[in-house]
Amino acid sequence: MNDFSQPVIDSIHKPRDAANPRERYAAGVMKYREMGYWQPDYAPKDTDVIALFRITPQPGVDPEEAAAAVAGESSTATWTVVWTDRLTACDIYRAKAYRVDPVPASNAAEPQYFAYIAYELDLFEEGSVANLTASIIGNVFGFKPLKALRLEDMRIPVAYLKTFQGPPTGIVVERERLDKYGRPLLGATVKPKLGLSGKNYGRVVYEGLRGGLDFLKDDENINSQAFMHWRDRFLFAMEAVNRAQAETGEVKGHYLNVTAGTMEDMYERAEFAKELGSCIVMIDLVIGWTAIQSMARWARRNDMILHLHRAGHSTYTRQRNHGISFRVIAKWLRMAGVDHAHAGTAVGKLEGDPLSVQGYYNVCRESHNEVDLSRGIFFDQPWAGLRKVMPVASGGIHAGQMHQLLDLFGDDAILQFGGGTIGHPAGIQAGAVANRVALEAMVKARNEGRDIVHEGPDILEAAARWCTPLKQALDTWRDVTFNYASTDTPDFAATPTAA
């Protein structure tokens, strides 16, 4: 039995003339670069899908051969020559690795490279993120000649984007429905995330909305458990929404998580949410791309906002050398069609370098992404009219960080203070009041031309003199930070984790 490691391949490999069909398709093993997967003179077409991979070859594996192997294994190749290639337009369908660059400041003992690979558009099914990902992140991520592999960015051609519906609502229409402009939206996740009865759950929702939040939210793992059936949660939560709306005169909402074990159950829950008058439903990333696109189509048909919690993403986005960058996930989510997507906080408890996170937000909400290496964006990306996704900042944030959050993310974002609302020493409603007052004070100061980055703490202290709940929030959390080194910073800009 042959051991198909690089040294053995080198020992049994005989150079062939790839232009000669007799040699090119003779049985046996060829290097991927000689099979046509390395084409340094290739000029990508406007209709090509382009992927940028970070590759870490095994010792002794040439980086160009490694890039060619990634191109081959993510498109048409297998480990040996197959004569059935001659039955296809393989010269067209094979992916082309056309550029390899060393990663700046990578470890000399374990060098990394950026590999640019172009894919013919016909390789992918129209309007299917599942099919796109089956190729781009399929078997190739387990390929032995690579020590590690990470998908850093993609250029999606306009011709392919036009086959996707994108977000069912989008930022502009959502603001019109809510009649809320000129500031970020405010939310909170119900805590504790598990264990509350339906009635107590509804009370938390009411208190948060009554205190000034725009949304309350189910957490990722609250579905339908022994302590609270999903139908009870929906009923009590919507009772709270309706009561808070009547008392405040503002449009309010609660993200009802319809995630379930089957699509039939998810549709049933979504339909019930609609019957109760909810304007929004929620799903988790872990349901998969086909289910996400299915729920996006349902939301579009039913004029509902679709919120996505990115539960599970860090299992493959957090490590810098292997997996997928969240900027790619953000692109796929926009194509799949969600209206909200959790995209990081930079200053909270979860992983996120400030510049990287700003890059994720830009992917979600810009009409055209320009190359911005400092934020990890490698490609010029027009969005072909796809609606914009509202990015969500959630996880370990509090009122004392309001100036940082507003400076980092601007108005088109949702700031979700779960523990920073529910954990307020004077109660849930006081926590909501503190966050609303802090936000409005900071927006007012920004609009007056003040330097909120440097004056932010003073602005909050001034507002707290007239708002006891805000003073209590600042006294409780003012010094709470999560200032740890980021595991995933842009290669072309070193930045600290905390803004």
Swiss-Prot record:
It comes from the Bacteria. Its EC number is 4.1.1.39. Mg(2+) binds at K217, D219, E220. Substrate binds at N139, T189, K193, R310, H342, S394. It catalyses: 2 (2R)-3-phosphoglycerate + 2 H(+) = D-ribulose 1,5-bisphosphate + CO2 + H2O; D-ribulose 1,5-bisphosphate + O2 = 2-phosphoglycolate + (2R)-3-phosphoglycerate + 2 H(+). The record marks K349 as: Transition state stabilizer. The modification N6-carboxylysine is found at K217. Its cofactor is Mg(2+). GO terms for biological process: reductive pentose-phosphate cycle. InterPro entries: RuBisCO, RuBisCo_large_chain_AS, RuBisCO_lsu_C, RuBisCO_lsu_C_sf, RuBisCO_lsu_fd_N, RuBisCO_lsu_N_sf, RuBisCO_lsuI. Keywords: Calvin cycle, Carbon dioxide fixation, Lyase, Magnesium, Metal-binding, Monooxygenase, Oxidoreductase. GO terms for molecular function: magnesium ion binding; monooxygenase activity; ribulose-bisphosphate carboxylase activity. Pfam families: RuBisCO_large, RuBisCO_large_N. The active site is at K191, H309. Binds 1 Mg(2+) ion per subunit. Belongs to the RuBisCO large chain family. Type I subfamily. RuBisCO catalyzes two reactions: the carboxylation of D-ribulose 1,5-bisphosphate, the primary event in carbon dioxide fixation, as well as the oxidative fragmentation of the pentose substrate. Both reactions occur simultaneously and in competition at the same active site. The basic functional RuBisCO is composed of a large chain homodimer in a 'head-to-tail' conformation. In form I RuBisCO this homodimer is arranged in a barrel-like tetramer with the small subunits forming a tetrameric 'cap' on each end of the 'barrel'. Heterohexadecamer of 8 large chains and 8 small chains. This is Ribulose bisphosphate carboxylase large chain. It comes from Paraburkholderia xenovorans (strain LB400).
